[in-house]
UniProtKB/Swiss-Prot annotation:
Protein family: Belongs to the RimP family.
Organism: Yersinia pestis
Record's function text: Required for maturation of 30S ribosomal subunits.
Protein localization: Cytoplasm
Superkingdom of the organism of origin: Bacteria
Identification of the protein by name: Ribosome maturation factor RimP
Keyword line: Cytoplasm, Ribosome biogenesis
Alphabetical list of Pfam families matching this protein: DUF150_C, RimP_N
Top-level taxonomy: Bacteria, Pseudomonadati, Pseudomonadota, Gammaproteobacteria, Enterobacterales
């Protein structure tokens, strides 16, 4: 997924303290607004607890206070990816081949920005998703948001 320059910088700053605590940094989102939000998604083989989120929040806050990459006031949120897990990297798509995904594109393809289908293949920075029986190819850089579709 095409991250903004700020999101790339934040990922570089945040990854070390998250990994030092034994967690995987799944991805981040920085949502600008009247009250901006920095959302950090973490995971581990044992799952994520509220205490894990608090530990990561404390460590990341300390690092961000020193580095100070965000010039506006913001809320920091740390959470597990959840059932509708966000997808940020080619590795995420590879890990979930055969699963259903919802995509929101930065620039429309075939007059559509929202797509839903089954992840069929990953080739470098391109993913193939089967939508209504037809294979569609998307550049990761054109994907604004992607989430797994949970099935119960």
């Amino acid at each position: 997924m095409g991250l903004s320059t700020l999101e790339q910088k934040l990922t570089e700053i945040i990854s070390a303290p998250v990994e030092a605590l034994g967690y995987e940094l799944v991805g981040i989102e920085f949502i600008r607004g009247r009250q901006s939000t920095l959302r950090i998604y973490i995971d581990s083989d044992d799952g994520i607890t509220v205490d894990a989120c608090a530990d990561v929040s404390h460590q990341v806050s300390a690092v961000l206070d020193v580095e100070d990459p965000i010039t506006v006031a913001y809320n920091l949120e740390v959470s597990s990816p959840g059932l509708d897990r966000p997808m940020f990297t080619a590795e995420h798509y590879t890990r979930y081949l055969g699963e259903e995904v919802t995509l929101v594109l930065r620039m429309a393809m075939q007059n559509r920005r929202k797509w839903q289908g089954i992840i069929k293949a990953v080739d470098g920075e391109m993913i193939t998703v089967t939508v209504d029986g037809k294979d569609e190819v998307f550049a990761l850089s054109n994907i604004q948001k992607a989430n797994l579709v949970p099935h119960f």
